[in-house]
Design a protein with these regions (language model features):
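Structural signal for interior beta-strand "rungs" in well-ordered beta-sheet cores
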Residues: 2-183, 187
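Terminal amphipathic alpha-helical/low-complexity segments used for targeting or macromolecular assembly
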Residues: 1-5, 10-11, 16-17, 53, ...
């Protein structure tokens, strides 16, 4: 159902069963999947690729040009997966040719009111980003991560899968998978054991993750030495290998350990 007071460019591609409320503006180079709902006063700009059964609340702006002085008007996109909710006044900027040329939001995500996602970010599946979080450009957020409200994340930071960041955090360094992060400066405060249990991780797996991070953050080793110990003492597993790969590939370095200054 498309309300007559909405403006939709005749070349926009709108699937079946899409509901578009009054005063929505949809530009030319837009694709919207079936079953999606677009709330009043939202603006869907060129380059938007929206999946099925999404909910985009009033005042959201999807696929705005990147806030990057190097951007010269080249074609780029914002891609949103299926079953994702974009709440009021969220702003999603499309990618730039100097990086991925797209900004990606996965499936089954929740971006709460006033979130900003800058150009070339990649957000995985089942991610929750709470109210007023500000993500700078080129950030990667992996599956099942949670970012607490009013946090600000520095460009190029990576936030690992199943991690949890407390509200109001300034995130300048990478946050490894399965961890909880808090305090200022942002530091390791444990593993996200509650979230892991909710997602079906066994007690043995959670205990192993906890012991791995005890070596990384509590034993005062440098990262290289900690990884050598982990590889020698722990049997290869999906979780162990994900932690090792994340730390080995970190470009900005990881957050501080508990009690470090």
């Amino acid at each position: 159902m498309i309300q007559p007071l909405a403006y939709i460019h005749p070349q926009a591609k709108i699937a079946d069963n899409v509901v578009i409320e009054p005063f929505v503006t949809i530009h030319k180079d837009v694709e919207i999947g079936e079953g999606t709902w677009i709330g009043s006063n939202s603006v869907i700009m060129d380059g938007a690729r929206i999946g099925k059964n999404c909910r985009i609340f009033p005042g959201a702006v999807v696929s705005a040009p990147p806030q990057d002085l190097k951007y010269k008007g080249e074609q780029s996109t914002v891609t949103i997966g299926d079953n994702t909710t974009i709440r009021e006044c969220v702003t999603l900027n499309r990618g730039t040719a100097l990086d991925k040329n797209t900004t990606t939001i996965g499936s089954n995500c929740l971006l709460m009111a006033y979130v900003h996602v800058a150009h070339d970010c990649v957000i995985g599946n089942n991610v929750i980003v709470a109210n007023a979080v500000q993500l700078a450009g080129h950030i990667t957020v992996y599956d099942y991560a949670f970012i607490g409200g009013s946090s600000a994340v520095h460009q190029f930071v990576e936030i690992g899968a199943h991690s949890m960041i407390s509200g109001g955090s300034l995130v300048r360094k990478d946050v490894p998978p399965y961890t909880k992060a808090g305090r200022e400066p942002l530091s390791y405060v444990g593993i996200n054991s509650v979230g892991l249990r909710r997602r079906g991780f066994s007690a043995a797996t959670i205990a192993e993750i906890q012991e791995i991070y005890r070596i990384i953050f509590l034993k005062k080793y440098n990262v290289t030495k900690a990884l050598d110990i982990i590889e020698a003492e722990f049997t290869p597993s999906e979780e162990r290998d994900e932690i090792i790969n994340f730390l080995q590939n970190s470009q900005r370095g990881i957050m501080k350990g508990f009690g470090n200054t």
